[in-house]
Structures are given as C-alpha cells and as structure tokens.
C-alpha cells in the first residue's frame, strides 16, 4: 500500500510539472526579440525614407489596410484610404515630409506579433513625436496606427496656447455639441 501511495504522489508531482506552461527565456528568445527590434527599426527607417522620397506606393504599403493615422492637427484622424487621398497631392509634388529618428523605443507583447513604439523625430516642424502600433503580418511589420505630435517646450506653452485657442475652441465647441 505504501508503494502505491509513493507512486501516486510521484505521478501527481510529475503531472503537475508537465502541465505547467513555461516561458522560454533562453538566449534564442532574446535573440528573436533583438532580431524583431532590428527588423522594426529598419522598417520604420524605410517608412520615413519612402515619405522623404515621395514614394507614395511604398509609403502606404507600410500600413495595414485598416490603419489609422492621426496628424498634428486635431482634425487629422483618417483611415488609410482617407489619408491616402489627403496625402496624394503632397506626394505628387515630389517631396512629402522628411522625418529622421533621433530616439526610438520599441516594445512587444508576449506573442511577439504586436509591437508599439514612440520616437522623437527631426522634422521640418522641428522635433515631433511619432508613436504607433505595429502588427506582424507574415514576415512583415505593418503600421496599424500612427500618431504624429508636435512637441512644445514647457517654457513657451502658454504663448502657444494663446495662438491656437481661437481655432481649437471652435473645434472643441463642435465636438461637444
């Protein structure tokens, strides 16, 4: 009887450990994350380069079909199709916008198929912040959502608020009606 109890106890312990989900924290996982991060850095640099070259097709190929773009103006929130319509005349002039990353932070969800980032950009508007959500589709990372924000130094924020108040008060009033 005692041998049966010991065998039963060992079987329960073995079953318990075999059923536990483990997270792979081997160097391979770290390598995969580093490789995915490099892939995203390359993708974002190419994304910005396509806009600088006014390569309309390549630039918009970086977006998912149901992507959202939010620009620096409070009225600029477009799905991909609307953003393409808005941007087409700008790209047709032969130069769109030229953004260069100054600093970039990239994060991943546990599945490794969703990432989000924020970056400081050197632009014609001076320093802007880009942030977004990326999804992995096949072997490619695609922009699901991108938000472009201008930065305003705290020392001059009160002056900027005064300048934009009339325009944005009108937008606020339209939105709360």
Give, region by region, the residue ranges found by the protein language model.
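Short, low-complexity N-terminal intrinsically disordered segments enriched in polar/charged residues
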Residues: 19-57, 61, 155-157, 161-177
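Short beta-strand edge/turn micro-motifs at domain boundaries
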Residues: 127-157
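Hydrophobic pocket/interface hotspot
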Residues: 47, 59-60, 67, 83, ...
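A short gly/proline-enriched turn/hairpin at secondary-structure junctions
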Residues: 68-78, 89-96
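Surface-exposed, charged secondary-structure patches
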Residues: 82-127
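Bacterial Sec-dependent N-terminal signal peptides
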Residues: 1-31
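A mature extracytoplasmic/lumenal domain signature
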Residues: 63, 73, 103, 110, ...
């Amino acid at each position: 009887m005692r041998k049966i109890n010991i065998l039963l106890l060992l079987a329960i312990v073995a079953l318990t450990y075999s059923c536990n989900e483990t997270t792979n924290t081997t160097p391979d996982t770290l390598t995969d994350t580093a490789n995915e991060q490099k892939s995203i850095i390359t993708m974002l640099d190419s994304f910005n380069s396509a806009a600088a070259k006014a390569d309309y097709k390549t630039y918009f190929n970086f977006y998912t079909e149901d992507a959202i773009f939010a620009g620096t103006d409070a009225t600029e929130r477009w799905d991909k199709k609307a953003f393409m319509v808005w941007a087409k005349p700008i790209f047709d002039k032969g130069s769109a916008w030229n953004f260069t990353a100054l600093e970039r932070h990239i994060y991943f969800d546990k599945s490794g198929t969703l990432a989000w980032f924020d970056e400081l950009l050197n632009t014609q508007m001076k320093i802007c912040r880009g942030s977004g959500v990326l999804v992995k589709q096949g072997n490619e990372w695609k922009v699901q959502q991108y938000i472009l924000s201008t930065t305003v130094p705290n020392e001059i924020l009160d002056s900027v608020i005064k300048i934009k108040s009339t325009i944005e008060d009108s937008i606020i009033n339209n939105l709360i009606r």
